[in-house]
A protein has these predicted regions:
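SDR active-site strand-loop-helix element
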Residues: 6, 30, 73-77, 111-117, ...
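N-terminal Rossmann NAD(P)H-binding glycine-rich loop of SDR-like oxidoreductase domains
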Residues: 3-23
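NAD(P)H-binding glycine-rich loop region in Rossmannoid oxidoreductase-like domains
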Residues: 55-92
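Active-site YXXXK catalytic motif of short-chain dehydrogenase/reductase
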Residues: 93, 142, 146
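Short alpha-helical oligomerization interface
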Residues: 82-96, 131-138
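NAD(P)-dependent short-chain dehydrogenase/reductase
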Residues: 125-127, 139, 151-211, 238-240
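Conserved Rossmann-fold NAD(P)-dependent oxidoreductase catalytic core, especially the SDR/UDP-sugar
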Residues: 75, 99-141
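C-terminal substrate-binding subdomain of Rossmann-fold SDR/epimerase-dehydratase oxidoreductases
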Residues: 189-309
Length: 309
């Protein structure tokens, strides 16, 4: 099987690529390295690595001419690093997704897409949120653009699976609270802890389910989540423990320091029905895997999709 992975140097894309190669599949990587990192590709054998933006129509032409067939597309590429960058969100998450969807139409192949839980807004009235809950992504430019991309896929007629995600963390996680905590603690800086909860789930668990989708399992939209949330302060304490510090770092606690909703829980019932869900890694395993990665490769910057006022 030949699988194209956009954002292949990112956290999700690189883990999926490694699992595909481990079972003998051929992988094509596309990444512009805006947030993906070259070291995430070190374990891959593939010679097909395109450093390009998915918003470039020339990439569409290049892939169309170079490959006679592509059996599946795993579309993880997204613009999220700057919550205020509307133009890049539109170019990458809307136009880029439309072009990738056209590519799936050309090759008549399955498309796997990844959506943010903020597609439901910042204060859904039902918890856990059911799949049929109305999409109203007004909380951020990122959510609006990702949802626009999802709508294009749905009206395109391609065979697709969309995973609407809880907070995916673990090795190679470079956005959100986990790498921020590690970076600030390592620098001797105070962390700011929000009075909020999030559903944290390991990227390695997600990657195994994505492989099932590549192989034809499922159809349409799914929640990838544990259905349980964790206080941000508890995640912080797990990070401190995993760093094996001989002191207790100071932190500031604020009601809603990071912005965003106090919690969004996603109902994973349909996912458990249609996929062979793995035993989910514990939060301790997930944090430990992330810290091991940071100790080896570092954290270069703090990344969030939330708007900065």
């Amino acid at each position: 099987m030949r699988v194209l992975i956009t954002g292949g140097a990112g956290m999700v894309g690189s883990h999926v690529a490694e699992l595909l190669e481990a079972r003998g599949d051929e992988v094509i990587i596309v990444d512009n390295f805006a947030t993906g990192r070259p070291e995430h590709l070190l374990n891959l054998r593939t010679q097909y690595k395109f450093e390009d933006s998915i918003a470039n129509e020339s990439l569409y032409a290049k892939l169309s001419s170079q490959f006679l067939n592509i059996d599946a597309i795993v579309h993880t590429a997204a613009s999220f690093a700057n919550g205020n960058d509307w133009s890049d969100h539109i170019n990458t998450n809307v136009l880029g997704t439309a072009l990738i969807t056209r590519l799936a139409q050309k090759f008549n192949c399955r498309l796997i897409y990844f959506q943010t839980a903020l597609c439901y807004g910042d204060n859904p009235t039902i918890q856990p949120v059911p799949l049929e809950y109305p999409r109203q992504p007004m909380a951020s430019s990122y959510a609006i653009s990702k949802t626009a991309g999802e709508f294009y896929i749905e009206q395109s007629g391609v065979d697709f699976v969309t995973f609407r995600l809880a907070n995916i963390v673990g090795p190679r996680n470079l956005s959100g609270p986990l790498p921020i905590f590690y970076k600030r603690i390592s620098a001797g800086e105070k962390c700011v802890i929000a009075n909020a909860k999030r559903d944290f789930i390991d990227v390695r668990n997600l990657a195994t389910v994505v492989l099932q989708a590549i192989d034809g399992r499922g159809n349409g939209a799914y929640h990838f989540s544990s259905g349980k949330d964790v206080q941000i302060i508890d995640l912080y304490k797990k990070v401190v423990s995993a760093m094996r510090l001989d002191f207790e770092p100071e932190y500031d606690f604020q009601e809603n320091a990071a912005g965003g909703p106090p919690s969004i829980l996603l109902d994973p019932t349909r996912t458990y029905s249609d996929f062979d869900m793995p035993t989910l890694n514990s939060i301790e395993e997930t944090v430990s895997g992330a810290i091991s990665y940071y100790e080896k490769f570092g954290v270069t910057r703090e990344v969030t999709h939330l708007k900065k006022n």
